[in-house]
Amino acid sequence: MADNYLEKKFEEYAAAKAGRRAPHRISPAGNRQGVVEFKFPRRRVVVAVPDADAVIEAFCNAGCQVAFCGTDIDGGQAYAEAVGAQFNPVNEFCAETLCRAMSRVMKAWRDIEIVICTAGMAQAITSHWRTLRSALPMEPDYGRVVVIGSETAEIPAIPNATVNDIVCRDINNAVASACLFFALPECGAVSGQTISTL
C-alpha cells in the first residue's frame, strides 16, 4: 500500500513538473538573455535624407516626434500618415530648401534635438540648425547630428552636440539602427566617428 502511494505521488509530481515552465533567466542588465533594450527618450527629429524610410520608421517606433522632407507630395503625405510622422514637401533636395523646411519645423516644435542629413548637405544644415538653436530662450543641453552618406563630409565642431557619420551601402535597417544608437543620450561622448556598413 505504501509503495502504491509513493508511485502516485511521484506521478503527480512529474506531471506538475512537466506542466511548469523553466524559470525565466535574467541577464545582469535585467533583460532577457539575448535581448538588449534601451530607454529612448521622446525627441524631436528631422530627417533630411531622401529615401530614408527605415530611419523614419525607427525613430517613430522609438516614440519620437519625426519630421521628414521629400519631393513626392502625395506619396510623402500618405507615408507620413501611415507611420505617424510629419511630412514637409520640398521642390528638390538642396541645402536652401531643406533649411527652409527645417525652419518651419523649428517654428512649430520650438526645438529640434536630432538632425539626420546627407553628407553633401551636412555643413549647410548643421550651420542652420546651430543658428536656429542659438535663438532659443534657454541653451539646449542635448543635440545630435547624424550624417548619412557614401563618403564623409567635413563638419565644423558643434558645442553641446555630437556629430557622427554613417557610410552606407544600401543596408537600410543597419543604417537606421546606427542612427538610433548615435541618438541615445548615453552616446554623447561618441563624436566624429565614421561607421562603414558592409
Language-model segments: what does each one mean?
Residues 107, 120-143, 150-154, 184:
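Amphipathic alpha-helical dimer-interface segment in Rossmann-like NAD(P)H-dependent oxidoreductases
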Residues 40-41, 82-86, 96-125, 140, ...:
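A glycine-rich helix->loop->beta "capping" turn
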Residues 72-75, 170:
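Helix N-cap at the beta1-alpha1 junction of Rossmann-like dinucleotide-binding domains, i.e.
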Residues 92:
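Hydrophobic anchor residue in the Rossmann-like NAD(P) cofactor-binding loop of oxidoreductases
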